[in-house]
Design a protein with these regions (language model features):
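Bacterial N-terminal signal peptides
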Residues: 11-20
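Surface-exposed short loop/turn segments
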Residues: 29-31, 103, 107-111, 115-160, ...
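Bacterial N-terminal signal peptides that target proteins for export
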Residues: 2-12
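A structural "domain/chain start" motif
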Residues: 26-99
Length: 192
């Protein structure tokens, strides 16, 4: 009998350990507990709910309170992008945001309009960088130009239906903006 209870106890302990580990692995990683949230030079002032962002499929961080937007909404209007990054590169990257967002939202099946849209997309560039000096030549892919982007998506009544945050790299800053918005628009269509 004691051997049976030891085996039973060991089996319960193993099952408990498996359930505990699987619960931890299954929980989506949140932005608030990530290293990205601790970056001092990347403002977190544009989106209303940074604590609700979770790791996304295509975009780095996403929050869609009602799931996928593609079937529910048909038309979209993209506003000019803002920037709260401190560099000139951030300002320049913000100029490219609207055009690339419209391009990729159309490719995902949304109709881009100038007014009376089902969805209103607001964008922000929170950081943009261009490597300097020898880093550009000796740093490899890690030294490519990059950009940090945020999208706030509202329906026509002003209710937030999506928030996204993404860092992307490219051969130039405009290329990084396009790469980031491509991933973000895929997430908008999929709702994850």
């Amino acid at each position: 009998m004691p051997a049976f209870s030891r085996r039973l106890t060991a089996a319960f302990a193993a099952a408990f350990l498996l359930l505990s580990v699987s619960a931890v692995l299954a929980a989506p990683k949140s932005f608030a507990s990530s290293d990205d949230a601790k970056e001092k030079d990347e403002p977190q002032k544009f989106l209303p709910d940074y604590d609700k962002l979770v790791q996304g499929k295509d975009a780095d961080w996403v929050y869609f309170p009602k799931g996928s937007l593609k079937g529910t909404y048909k038309t979209v209007m993209v506003k000019d992008f803002e920037h709260n990054g401190k560099s000139r590169d951030s300002r320049d990257a913000a100029r490219d945001g609207k055009e690339y967002a419209e391009q990729w939202l159309e490719k995902e099946g949304f109709e881009v309009v100038e007014k009376n849209a089902d969805l209103i997309v607001e964008g922000n560039v929170f950081n943009a960088w261009e490597p300097s000096g020898a880093a550009r030549y000796w740093g490899g892919w890690a030294a490519n130009p990059g950009v940090g982007l945020e999208l706030l998506i509202k329906n026509k009544s002003g209710e937030v239906v999506g928030e996204l945050r993404q860092k992307a790299k490219g051969s130039t800053v405009p290329d990084a903006v396009e790469n980031g918005l491509e991933d973000m628009c895929k997430s908008v269509a999929a709702g994850k």
